[in-house]
Amino acid sequence: MTNSRNKSLSINKGSDVNDSINPNYRSKRIASKSLKEYVEGILKGDRTTLSQAITLIESSKDEYRELGQQVLEECMPETGNSVRIGITGVPGVGKSTFIEAMGQHILQQNRKLAVLAIDPSSSRSKGSILGDKTRMQNLSNHDNAFIRPSPTSGTLGGVAQRTRETLLLCEAAGFNTIFIETVGVGQSETTVHSMVDFFLLLMLPGAGDELQGIKRGVMEMADLIAINKAEDETNQMAQRAKKEYENALALFPPTESGWKPKVTTCSALKNVGITEIWDEIQSYLWLTRDNGYFDLRRKEQAAFWMHETIH
C-alpha cells in the first residue's frame, strides 16, 4: 500500500502536480537538496529537481521560499532564452486540445516545451490545465515537455509572480518554448500579457454580434486570433467569424510592435492549421527582433516585475 501511495505521489515524467496530500512527504522531498544541488540539477535539465525548486517558490514556509529565491538568483544568468507565448480563450474553446496539438508540433522541431498556467481560482483537486491531463497525455509523457499547473492559492498578483518565477526556472532548465495558459477571459489576460512575447487568442466559430463577450482590451492585446474547431460542419461559421474579427481588428490603432494582428482558423482536434499558426508566431518573432521591439519589451517586462516584487 505504501509503495502504491508513494508511486501515485511521484512526479510523472513531464507533468507535475503540486500535491498537498501528504505534507510530510513533500517537506522531506523539498528539503533534501542543498542550494548547489538544486542549481546543478536545474541547469542539467532535470525535471524532478525543477519541480522541487518550483515547490520551494510556491511554499507557504519562509525558509523554503527563501531557498527557492536563492535558487532562482543563481539560475538567473541562464534565463531569457525562450519564446514566451500566452494562450487564452473563452471556456469550451479547446485550449487543452490546442496546446496538445501545437505542443507536439513544436517538439517535432527539436524544441523543449514547458506549459504553465495562471488560474487564481484553481484548487488542488480541480487544477486548471491539469484538471484533465488526458487531454495532453502525449505532452505529459514526452521527455522534452514539462507541464505545471497554476499555483493554487493567493491573489492574482501572487499567483502571477510565482508563475513568472516558474517561467524563469524553466528557462534555466533549458526549455526554450514556454506556454502560459490562462483560464477564462478576464483580468488574468492582462497579467499574462505582461510576461509573454506573443499573445494568442483562441475563439469559437459563430462569433455573432457580441464577439463572444470578449472585452476590447483582450482583443487589442492579441497578436493573433485563431478560430478553433473550424471543422466540416462549422467551417462556414468559422469563415464568417474570421471576417467579423478582421473587421473589428481594423478599427484598432496600430501596434507598438509594428506587427499587424491577423485572424486565422484551425482545428486542433484534426491538426489542421496548427503549422500555419506556428509559422505566424515565427514571423512575428523575426519582425520584432529585427526592429528592436522584442528586446525593448523584454526590458519593460523585467522592470515591471521588479517593481511588482518590491511593492
Q: Can you annotate each of these PLM segments?
A:
Residues G89:
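The Walker A (P-loop) glycine that initiates the GxxxxGKT/S ATP-binding motif of P-loop NTPases
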Residues M1-L43, T49:
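Long, basic/Gly/Ser/Thr-rich N-terminal segments
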Residues S34-I85, V93, I99-S188, M195-L202, ...:
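Nucleotide-state-sensitive switch-loop elements of NTP-binding domains
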Residues A207-Q236:
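Flexible active-site lid/hinge loop adjacent to a nucleotide/diphosphate
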